[in-house]
């Protein structure tokens, strides 16, 4: 069991015991975070970033860690999230293996990793932990709360469970509930991990490690993170050089197969499998319809419960952005977020971007996502 904590990571101790939404408690838990910029005297210029499943808190280079971060093009002086103006905080999700307490962390009661004894994790737990970091930094209200992918879910839960915590919100490629397609994909990913004999009921180590299962899970994920349009444009039906092609007729032959294999191998040893299972399942369970005043399903309009849940959020301004080619969190989900927030009284806008990169577009298509984020923050 390994945690992967970047240099310069800071830690916030959560209240102990910490009750979890689905039952169970954590003791001596912590959240990893990093910061950029300077907090104003009135603490009114804070921006919080909550992340997708796999990122750490190192969104960009800073004084504590000059290495480029996972959102380097978006966070920094003069960048769309301008640290000359904003005090930016990025938190690593509770349940992760990148510094926050998760299944790979040591259980203080046993002195051994939690593994599957870690309590069931919900997006709401992730949100509550992030809110505690905000309060600990002396921030009464964020100027803006930004969430991307799973972080879009976390942000909505945070806004709903902690009213008044932010003046504005940017939801990037997020959703207010998990769709059946997304649940199905994540189910296959978890099954691939759990069927690997080296997973061993969660009791693996660095030698006996479920590498094949993690590799398959990552390949499935990468396929859904991009779009058919991008696959066609990047790879077409181009084959590998003959000297790189295995004798096996079912081995790697096309460039796209080689890309998936290389991408998966780079990932598998840098994310804990049990943490992957917990965070993945937390997204399946997330559904803002639970917070609708009337939880009875409307057969004629099943989305009404989600919209009613979103309408419970009180925020002044919001922007929901997505890529039109996203198949994992389809752009209709971001449109739904804007609609629901408007019903709650927000000045909420929706922006669907014609990016070919699918769900991962916010991580690579800065030419489209950067100006949208910059323009929104200019009015905050």
UniProtKB/Swiss-Prot annotation:
Organism in which the protein naturally occurs: Xanthomonas campestris pv. campestris (strain ATCC 33913 / DSM 3586 / NCPPB 528 / LMG 568 / P 25)
Molecular function in Gene Ontology: homoserine O-acetyltransferase activity; homoserine O-succinyltransferase activity; L-serine O-succinyltransferase activity
Main localization (coarse): cytoplasm
Pathway given in the UniProt record: Amino-acid biosynthesis; L-cysteine biosynthesis; L-cysteine from L-serine: step 1/2
GO cellular component, one term: cytoplasm
Domain AB hydrolase-1: 45-365
Keyword match Cytoplasm: yes
Described function: Transfers a succinyl group from succinyl-CoA to L-serine, forming succinyl-L-serine. In vitro, also has homoserine succinyl transferase activity.
Catalytic activities: succinyl-CoA + L-serine = O-succinyl-L-serine + CoA; L-homoserine + succinyl-CoA = O-succinyl-L-homoserine + CoA
EC number: 2.3.1.-, 2.3.1.46
Site (Important for acyl-CoA specificity): 186
NCBIfam families: homoserO_Ac_trn, PRK00175.1
PANTHER family named among the record's database cross-references: HOMOSERINE O-ACETYLTRANSFERASE
Family matches, as SUPFAM superfamilies: alpha/beta-Hydrolases (SSF53474)
Localisation per UniProt entry: Cytoplasm
Active-site residues, Swiss-Prot/TrEMBL: 149 (nucleophile), 326, 359
Keyword terms: Acyltransferase, Amino-acid biosynthesis, Cysteine biosynthesis, Cytoplasm, Transferase
Family: Belongs to the AB hydrolase superfamily. MetX family.
GO biological process, one term: methionine biosynthetic process
Annotated region described as Important for substrate specificity, given as residue ranges: 52-55
Residues holding substrate: 218, 360
Record's protein name: Serine O-succinyltransferase
Pfam families reported for this sequence: Abhydrolase_1
Enzyme class, first EC level, given as a word: transferase
């Amino acid at each position: 069991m390994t945690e992967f904590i970047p240099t310069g990571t800071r830690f916030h101790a959560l209240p102990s015991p910490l009750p979890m939404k689905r039952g169970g408690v954590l003791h001596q838990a912590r959240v990893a975070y990093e910061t950029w910029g300077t907090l104003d005297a009135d603490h009114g210029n804070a921006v919080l970033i909550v992340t997708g499943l796999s990122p750490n808190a190192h969104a960009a280079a800073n004084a504590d860690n000059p290495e480029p971060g996972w959102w380097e093009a978006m966070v920094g002086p003069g960048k769309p999230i301008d640290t000359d103006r904003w005090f930016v905080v990025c938190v690593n999700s509770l349940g992760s293996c990148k510094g926050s307490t998760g299944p790979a962390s040591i259980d203080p009661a046993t002195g051994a990793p939690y593994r599957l004894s870690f309590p069931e994790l919900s997006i709401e737990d992730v949100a509550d932990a992030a809110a505690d970091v905000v309060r600990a930094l002396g921030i009464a209200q964020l100027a803006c709360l930004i969430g991307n992918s799973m972080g879009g879910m976390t942000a909505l839960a945070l806004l709903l469970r902690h009213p008044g915590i932010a003046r504005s919100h940017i939801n990037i490629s997020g959703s207010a509930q998990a769709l059946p397609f997304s649940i199905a994909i994540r189910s296959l990913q978890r099954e691939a991990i759990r069927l690997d004999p080296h997973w061993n009921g969660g009791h693996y180590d660095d030698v006996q490690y479920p590498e094949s299962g993690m590799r398959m899970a990552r390949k499935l994920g990468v396929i859904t993170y991009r779009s058919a349009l991008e696959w066609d444009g990047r790879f077409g039906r181009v084959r590998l050089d003959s000297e790189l092609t295995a004798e096996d007729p079912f081995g790697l032959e096309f460039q796209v197969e080689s890309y998936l294999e290389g991408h998966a191998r780079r990932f598998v040893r840098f994310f804990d499998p049990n943490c992957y299972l917990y965070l993945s399942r937390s997204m399946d369970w997330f559904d803002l319809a639970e917070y609708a005043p009337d939880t009875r399903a409307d057969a004629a309009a099943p989305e009404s419960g989600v919209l009613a849940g979103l309408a419970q959020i009180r925020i002044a301004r919001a922007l929901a952005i997505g890529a039109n080619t996203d198949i994992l969190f389809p752009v209709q989900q971001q449109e739904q977020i804007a609609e629901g927030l408007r019903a709650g009284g927000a000045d909420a806008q929706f922006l669907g971007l014609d990016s070919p990169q699918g769900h991962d577009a916010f991580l690579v298509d800065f030419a489209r996502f950067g100006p949208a984020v910059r323009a929104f923050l200019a009015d905050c």
